[in-house]
């Protein structure tokens, strides 16, 4: 009889944070909105708060970067560790150290689904439909997958069943699709800058931006718009038709997460051939099932916000059953190891975090060491061939552990 590998139990879980409202600003890391001054990601981008003039110019003005980065580390009895990062900051640390720890410590490193289910059910009474609590659960889940991979000596994508393609090809999210084309990306997704409170003038300005980039990038380069929950159905429909002459590939997250009827109407009225996408700020498996039923073309969960890798795999299955694509919101290695195993993810997102979009910078810089970036718009699966998620925690960052147990 062959020997079966004996897996260790989890000895301890620890939680740190960096950046956010109670720490230094501009720390970057898992909270990629926490950038310094003069960064494209904070430059007059349309949001649900843009209708208030005092919060229109800057997303940081209404507090988009107050949470900061959460870092969760799990340690096995044999001394091996796994970790992950997300957006939950100091409040996420409290949830991990004072509540979720009881479901983690003492379990086998392979008990990921059991721990996941217990965390979800134990927080139902205060988690609502996602948000901070789900971000925290996601971070724990990713740390568990990282630890499991390191214990058995395999990359996470092989734990999921292996790659279905040799490489991942990327589009870039930034303000300069023309520069993204020069770097080898297959497309560029720009933020919108205007919303319903700006009327038809706002539509004309954003459509003119698309027209300008179409001229600069040529006919074959993908162009997309990210509307970040800032519109209503009528405005989004008019904007989609205004951009149709410039071959806009898709229009993204026009409406707040729970407006399912609005997404159904938008998909029904969008120009033929233009895709409607959403999902970045949906936080539960059930919400993605309902979103899928609206008939949108691409679901875009964030693996650090939707419940972790365990939930992302389930979301991909829902999308596949309906013939939909799942293209996760850019989450670096945490997305890479998942999407290379999904047959309904033919491309992925890379979120540019360099201030002017002119250079390649790892998305979660500086919190991850050895974080890969696309080369000529691609990452080969061999780059992912390291145990776990293949990155290490940069302990030189100003990590704070406000709670213990």
Swiss-Prot record:
Keyword Glycosyltransferase attached: no
SMART domains for the chain: MR_MLE
Site, Increases basicity of active site His: residue positions: 302
Cofactor: binding comment: Binds 1 Mg(2+) ion per subunit.
Principal EC category: lyase
One GO molecular-function entry: magnesium ion binding
Cofactor entry: Mg(2+)
Example of a GO biological process term: amino acid catabolic process
Annotated substrate binding sites: 33, 59, 349
Catalytic activity as recorded in UniProt: L-rhamnonate = 2-dehydro-3-deoxy-L-rhamnonate + H2O
SUPFAM superfamilies listed in its UniProt record: Enolase C-terminal domain-like, Enolase N-terminal domain-like
Residues holding Mg(2+): 226, 252, 280
Pfam families linked to this entry: MR_MLE_C, MR_MLE_N
Active site positions: 329 (proton acceptor)
Keyword terms of this UniProt record: Lyase, Magnesium, Metal-binding
UniProt EC number: 4.2.1.90
InterPro entries on file: Enolase-like_C_sf, Enolase-like_N, Enolase_C-like, L-Rhamnon_dehydrat, Mandel_Rmase/mucon_lact_enz_CS, Mandelate_racemase_C, Mandelate_racemase_N_dom, RHMD-like
PROSITE patterns linked: MR_MLE_1 (PS00908)
Site (Transition state stabilizer): 349
Binding partners and assembly: Homooctamer; tetramer of dimers.
Miscellaneous comment in the UniProt entry for this protein: Reaction proceeds via a syn dehydration.
Role according to the record: Catalyzes the dehydration of L-rhamnonate to 2-keto-3-deoxy-L-rhamnonate (KDR).
Family listed: Belongs to the mandelate racemase/muconate lactonizing enzyme family. RhamD subfamily.
Entry protein name: L-rhamnonate dehydratase
Organism field: Escherichia coli O127:H6 (strain E2348/69 / EPEC)
